[in-house]
Amino acid sequence: SQLDYHDCHEAFDKKLKQYKKHGYLIPNHKMIKNEKQIEAIKRAAVVNNGLLDYIEEHIQIGMTTQDIDDMAVAYTSSHGGYSADLNYEGYPKSICTSVNDEVCHGIPGDYVLQDGDIINVDATTGVNGYFADASRMFMLGHVSEEAQRLVKVTKECLEEGMKAVKPWESTIADIGTAIEKHAHANGYSVVEEFCGHGIGKAMHEDPYVYHYTPKEKTVLIVPGMVFTIEPMINQGTRHIHLGTDNDWTVYTDDGKLSAQWEHTLLV
């Protein structure tokens, strides 16, 4: 009933205030989604995850990255969704396809997928004004053991970050600490320039989700928050640069491999 909802809401706000008194940085109301918003985000996530499943079934050596983008457009539109990436701040395509030493924002084009490549496909899908965001790594043909290990450890970094999410107990910083610890233990570095983010009615919302231990205080994690965790893990140096071919694609400074896995998470 409306009364139960009001009581529940009031108790939640009271609990937040208590945590604030104890020195915690608490999330604002925009960061906490209601049931209706959560259901809408879930609908977008079903299409977005379905798209990545579809790509997993069809991606192959000899295909261009543009072919993957074409697949994404066809799948998303036929399932009642649309790409949030297309025309976002002028981005020209519907997904990002980042190959080998490309860290993120690889633009689909005429690059032909080769035996031994690793590729990240990152998709953000909108359905009725709500969004979900995820990315996966795909390995093509005979991939080196070093590349396989990077892909595996990067996925584990995402999983460690997710395990650190404990409502009313952990803060956003705990996610970054868990990711960084696992990456460093395996001899890898964490890209610091790009982070996860809140998501819902916009593709990028607060909070900013670090993949390393930040210096500043971060918000308490509470039920109803929806955000992405999307670590980019490098084989060599963490340092990166924008390529000269476009205003989007980012590369590792040393030309070594980079990998990323991403989930949208509901607390």
Question: What residues fall within each predicted segment?
Answer:
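Short Cys/His-based metal-binding microdomains
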Residues: 1-20
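Active-site neighborhoods and metal-handling regions in enzymes and metal-associated proteins
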Residues: 22-267
